[in-house]
Structures are given as C-alpha cells and as structure tokens.
Amino acid sequence: MSENAETFAFQAEIAQLMSLIINTFYSNKEIYLRELISNASDALDKIRYQALTEPSELDTGKELFIKITPNKEEKTLTIMDTGIGMTKADLVNNLGTIAKSGTKAFMEALQAGADISMIGQFGVGFYSAFLVADKVVVTSKNNDDDSYQWESSAGGSFVVRPYNDPELTRGTKITMYIKEDQVDFLEERKIKEIVKKHSQFIGYPIKLVVEKEREKEVEDEEAVESKDEEKKEGDVENVGEDADAEKDKKKTKKIKEKYFEDEELNKTKPIWTRNPDDISNEEYAEFYKSLSNDWEDHLAVKHFSVEGQLEFRALLFAPQRAPFDLFENKKSKNSIKLYVRRVFIMENCEELMPEYLNFIKGVVDSEDLPLNISREMLQQSKILKVIRKNLVKKCMELFDEIAEDKDNFKKFYEQFGKNLKLGIHEDSTNRKKLSEFLRYATSAGEEPTSLKEYVSRMKENQTQIYYITGESKEVVAASAFVERVKSRGFEVLYMCDPIDEYCVQQLKEYDGKKLVSVTKEGLELPETEEEKKKFEEDKVAYENLCKVIKDILEKKIEKVAVSNRLVSSPCCIVTSEYGWSANMERIMKAQALRDSSTMGYMAAKKHLEINPDHAIMKTLRERVEADKNDKTVKDLVVLLFETALLSSGFSLEEPQSHASRIYRMIKLGLDIGDEDIEESAVPSSCTAEAKIEGADEDASRMEEVD
C-alpha cells in the first residue's frame, strides 16, 4: 500500500446498503453494467457541457467514449470513460462518506420487496458493482486535480491513494474483481447481450475490447530440419547456385495468432434523435425489428419531436399484425420504451400510453424527466401526463395517415379494430376522433362503411343511425328486426363483434345523429299520417290479444305490444332501451366470472312485439275473441314466444319442453296417434312434459292455425 494511502469508513447507511447488496440473492445482477454505463454517460455529458463554454477542457482528450475490457485470466472487468472524472474529494464524498438522499429510501424500498434494478433511480447505482465483484478499484482523473485511486472490498472501509495511470488523461476507470460464481459476466457474448438490452442507445460509443484470431505465415522449422538431415546424407550440392531461389523455396506454415481490438457495440445511433427527412424506410424498418423482435416490417411510422416548455422526441410504429396474445391479462400493457436523455429507464411504461393502444411499439426520449425517476414517481408526474396526451394525439394522426390508403387501412382494421372500439369505450377525450375510424358491414352492400359515409347516404327524412348487433353478418342480415327498416329503404349497420356491444354503450351519437338499435323498444321510423293512423287502429284492435298473451306468459316478459318493425315474421322479442340486447345477454352468459345478480335484472326486461298484419296473429286474435278460454291458445302462445326468443337471438331456459312442443306439432301434422308416440324413441319424461291439455280434441283446430 502506498505511503500516502488514506483509509476511510463508509457512512453507516452506505455500509448497510452494501451489506444488503452483497448478502442478498438477486436474480437480475446484470443491471450493474447498465448502471455503470449510465454513470459513465452522465460524466461524458458533464464534460461535453463544460466544453461548450471552455473548449480547453477537452485538451486532455478530445474523444468521448466508454470502453469495457474483460480480462479472463485476472478475472477483472474494467469500464473506462473519458468523462469529467473525479477529484480526490469527489471520490471520498461520493463513493462512501456522504450518503445520497436516496440511500435510505432505496434500502427501505428493497426491504419492502422492490426490484434491485431500481438502484439507479435512487442515485446509488455505483454500488451495484458489488453484485458481481468482491473488490472494486476506481481510478479517476479530473482536470482540476491529480489522478487518485479508490479501492474497497466492502468491508466497512475504503482506501484512497494517489495513483498515476498513463492510459487515463481524464475520466474514470472502474475495475471490478469478479466473484468466482459470476465469471460468465466476463464472456464477450454476455456483455454484448446486456449492452444491447440496456444501453444500446447511449449517446457515446461503447467499445468492447474483444479477443480475435488471425492467420500468420511463419517459417516451418520442422521442414527446415528435415532438409538439413537430407543434406547430411551426402547429396551433392552446388553451393553457389541461385541462393535467392533457395530462399524462395523456404517452407512456411500458417499459424493462428490471438490479438485484441476495440469493437463498437452501439453503432446504431439513437434513430429518434436524427432528422426524419434523413432517415430511409429501410432504417426505420431495421430499427422497428430490433425494437419489437418482429420479423415483418412495420405498417406505418410516426416520428416527431415536441419543443417548448416540455421537450421530448418519440418514434411510434404500427405493426402489420396483432400478436396472438394482444389482450391477455398477463401481457404488459404496452410496448413503449422510456429513455431520459438517451439513457434507457424502463420498458413497457404503462403511464405513457392507454391500454387500448398497447399494440403501438416505440420509444420516447424525454429531456425533462429526472434520470432517477421511479415507477411511483411516474404515476404522479405531470410531465408524463403531458407526454401521454401528445402520444395519443399523434397516434390519431398516424391512424389518419393509414386511413388515406384504403387497402392499408383494411389490413390495419382487421388486426386492430378491437383496440379502436375498446378506445371508444375507455377514452372519452378521443371518442369522437376514434369513431371516425370505425368500419361496419351494412345492409346497403358488401363493402364495410364508415359512419361518415353512412351519414352521407342517409335519407332526407332519416334522423337516426340504425344498427343491429349479433353473432355474424348472416344472422343479423336475416333477422326479423331489420325487415321493416330495410323495406323502408333505410340502411342498417351490422355490428358482429362482441366488443361492439360495449362500444355502442358509450358511442351514443355520431355527427349529431343518435345511434339506435333496431332490437330495442322505442324504434321510431319516419311515418306518413296514414301509417300513423293505421298503427293506432292496430293497437286498439289487438289490445285484448296483447292482454291475453301477457297473462299466459306472466313474468317471462315485461309487456306485449303491437310492432311497427315486422314485415314477414309474426312476432319478435325486443329489450328495453337500457337493458341488454340478445347479443349482449349471450356474451354475458359466456363470462366465467359473471355476476348472477346483474344477469337477473339486466336480462329480465324483454318485450314481445306482435305483427298485426301477419296471418298467425290475425287468426289467433279471432280465436281469442271467439273463445277467451280456448285451450290451444295457451300452447300456441308459448310456442310462438319460444320461437321468437330463438329467432331474436336469445337462448331458451327449457329447451327440452320446447322440443316436446315441436314433437307434438309434428305428431299432429303427421296424424300420429298417442299409441304410436308411446312406442317412439322420445323418452317418457319428454312425452309427459309434452302432453298438452285438450290436445286431442283440438288437433284439427291447431292444424288450421298451422
């Protein structure tokens, strides 16, 4: 030890922190390299900043870089930078005797279960070196002081001594003596992997000293020896004959020689810091692939910077296709990487992007956020809220750009339409803008249409936008609900995606036009005076039948009314304006964790609407008026109700009793007697259930109705 070496004790909190780092098992020890490179980058930032006003500061070394040197023989890893360097006082104070404000906070966070990777966010990243090293030596040279060396084996104290390192004209060199069980951190492959993951876009070259091999030609000594032996055996030789030719004939062989050279690990300069006009599509594609691990090129890109009170740059990509696990709960909420002044802070930063935009990949590089920001601080950060607002706005612009190309937008919508609909459900601020991107099949043609196009085709007397939700386009197109609307020449939007149900709950109107479901009560179609008059007359004429049907069905329906929406169907089931549609009920029944109490009151409000112009309803009305207690009426009403449930998209609570009624009708149609039924394959329980009071004597009358 040098005579001038001084020993210092670590401040109590720092000693405690080091003990915690050394004696606790952490799985992600690799973060030590990120922290030391980040510190080196900060030191380079400082000297670059000083040189703006005092260019002579760079006389001690113009090149600004970070160099990593692994030495497998001595089991050391050295990280050197040509940054501002530290004076003796800096070494003593910053690396041991004065605790940073974050030291205690970080220890408390660690003991509460925080991740070790947050160490840099508390300003104590240097000590992460002890995750992989049992001794650390720091040599540093500042322009205002001589060169000094700091050394510690984390035993509660450290030593500082004058030390001259010819390689270090300015900057800091950290040498770590790697623990026996951590030697894989000396592997070239491992170092490259960590740098690529955490420090790929640091604004200074990161060089790695790599060992390489090259072939070298040397004289083959064995061949020379054997030739000498041949000569000794007595061959006659002309000594003076062409000595040069003899020289040429000397045997050589190739050997492999090891040598060391610097390899730059972060040649990809942060693409987002460059001018978008200077970046080719190929460069964007290459960067997108390295960022997202996607094998395909991106669909669209948005590259922008915001300046003023708040400064940040961002690069956002829309992929070609959605990942298969896009909406899985365990999946990270988004794919945005956050950098602060080119230093990587975290990936999947949830606060930067709403969940419905989780498919957007990209980076955000802020000039204003502090480098030591933690996830907790992010949640409170006003700067982040402003960045988020700007990012969402730029995403809307990106979607606008994609929509300019119809084919491109079609691809995009097939993959990410669900996200846009989820956005309408969740993001009230951008709901209006998002609604412009919706596309639906309609009754007017094969091509999906936007709401804007729908409105442009609306009839003069049409004041509402009509839509129907259902399982598939084929099902909704054949639905009884669209009969009258289509026959009047009004266009109906076909919403066949389960998420559409949630979407239209929030999207009440578009361009001042209310969205109206044709499956719910209160459907108002433009009518002439004559039609209005007929409708009122039908209501009076069918009042008695409506009452009888309500009495028969009791609690199964809330009310029975004359319909203005049916043409060829005898009846249909509609729901109240604020209740669930048949499609929504189907979706909710499929939920494994559904709330049965909600199911009870949301699904109960069903209304039966009857078609006054249909032969079945006319005959049924006559039957009721002739004999209020006609025994076939009850069974016919139940059968009509259950059939209407099915055709309206609902499921039956008792499918077996419905099947039994159908079998009974088939029996009557085929004129089969009871004794044949008993011999058939229908179970006796079904037959018992299917027994209809007074069926035999009224068989002929049912056939008439049929």
Curated annotation (Swiss-Prot):
GO terms for molecular function: ATP binding; ATP hydrolysis activity; ATP-dependent protein folding chaperone; identical protein binding; nuclear glucocorticoid receptor binding; protein phosphatase 5 binding; protein phosphatase activator activity; unfolded protein binding. ATP binds at residues 39, 81, 100, 126, 375. InterPro entries: HATPase_C_sf, HSP90_C, Hsp90_fam, Hsp90_N, Ribosomal_Su5_D2-typ_SF. Molecular chaperone that promotes the maturation, structural maintenance and proper regulation of specific target proteins involved for instance in cell cycle control and signal transduction. Undergoes a functional cycle that is linked to its ATPase activity. This cycle probably induces conformational changes in the client proteins, thereby causing their activation. Interacts dynamically with various co-chaperones that modulate its substrate recognition, ATPase cycle and chaperone function. Belongs to the heat shock protein 90 family. The lineage of its organism: Eukaryota, Metazoa, Ecdysozoa, Nematoda, Chromadorea. The gene is hsp-90. The TPR repeat-binding motif mediates interaction with TPR repeat-containing proteins. Pfam families: HATPase_c_3, HSP90. It comes from the Eukaryota. GO terms for biological process: cellular response to heat; chaperone-mediated protein folding; chemotaxis; dauer larval development; defense response to Gram-negative bacterium; determination of adult lifespan; protein export from nucleus; protein folding. Its main location: cytoplasm. This is Heat shock protein 90. Residues 236-245 have a biased composition (Acidic residues).
